[in-house]
A protein has these predicted regions:
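Acyl activation and transfer enzymes in specialized metabolism, enriched
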Residues: 38-63, 175-194
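Gly/Ser/Thr-rich phosphate-binding loops and adjoining beta-strand/alpha-helix segments
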Residues: 6-8, 20-52, 66-82, 97, ...
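Helical lid/core segments from catalytic subdomains that handle acyl or acyl-like groups
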Residues: 90-145
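Residues in well-ordered beta-strands of folded domains
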Residues: 30-32, 85-89, 98-101, 136-140, ...
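Short amphipathic alpha-helices and their capping loops
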Residues: 1-22, 83-89
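A common structural junction motif
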Residues: 121, 198-205
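Intrinsically disordered, low-complexity linker/assembly segments
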Residues: 150-180, 184-186, 194-199
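Conserved GHKL (Bergerat-fold) ATPase module
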Residues: 2-3, 22-24, 82, 95, ...
């Protein structure tokens, strides 16, 4: 559910006043993640790596207070549900968007992920959810990337998590992960904590 709230009654009051009308309010932080466990689980249990990564992002976001807030059209909104948006390569060679509701049940999330993305790919039609806080993702696995800085548009102020191809070594598999967020939504320290919590979610899976 989506509810408008008074920013002056939240701890984001100062940030809302400072950044709501800023020409470039988006910030990007990058952290290199140890994803060895995700790769191992993907191979052992048959999950797609992207499914596991998206589930970990959703699980971490659902426990992050700031990621339930979103500035939009000069107002501040609070959401009680999280969904993950993925970019899907469709059957015609183009791309579409697909929103997947987060659930703590990994098996259910996997079923939803496979069902919804398959439908979007086959029908070449994007699928969106209303009333959910959407955390965007973009996986550009064609090459290794050190950092991804998303283009700012006032049509999409949602947080976004982006990555490229992961890097294997003898003992670890590493992945630089870029996290873009709106400064009204959170401060740099909050974003850094989100990335650290995401790493811990991956470790604990």
């Amino acid at each position: 559910m989506k509810n408008e709230i008074n920013p002056k009654e939240t701890k984001r009051a100062f940030a809302f006043e400072m950044w709501m009308t800023a020409p470039m309010p988006m910030v990007t932080l990058v952290k290199t993640m140890d994803i060895s466990k995700l790769v191992k689980i993907s191979k052992k249990r048959g999950f797609k790596f992207n499914t596991l990564m998206c589930w970990c992002i959703g699980k971490t976001a659902s426990k992050t207070e700031e990621l339930h807030l979103l500035p939009e059209d000069g107002k501040l909104y609070q959401y009680d549900q999280i969904a993950i948006n993925v970019v899907v390569r469709n059957s015609k060679g183009g791309i579409n968007s697909c929103d997947i509701p987060h659930t703590e049940d990994l098996q259910q999330f996997n079923r939803d992920y496979m069902k919804l993305t398959t439908k979007v790919a086959e029908e070449c039609q994007s699928s969106f959810l209303d009333g959910y806080m959407i955390v965007g993702t973009s996986a550009m696995i064609q090459t290794e990337l050190d950092c991804v800085v998303n283009q700012y548009t006032d049509k999409f102020l949602n947080p976004m998590v982006m990555w490229g191809k992961y890097r294997k070594s003898w003992f670890k598999t590493l992945l630089p992960v870029s996290f873009q967020f709106h400064h009204v939504q959170m401060d740099g320290g909050d974003a850094a904590r989100f990335l650290e919590k995401l790493q811990q979610t991956i470790f604990s899976l």
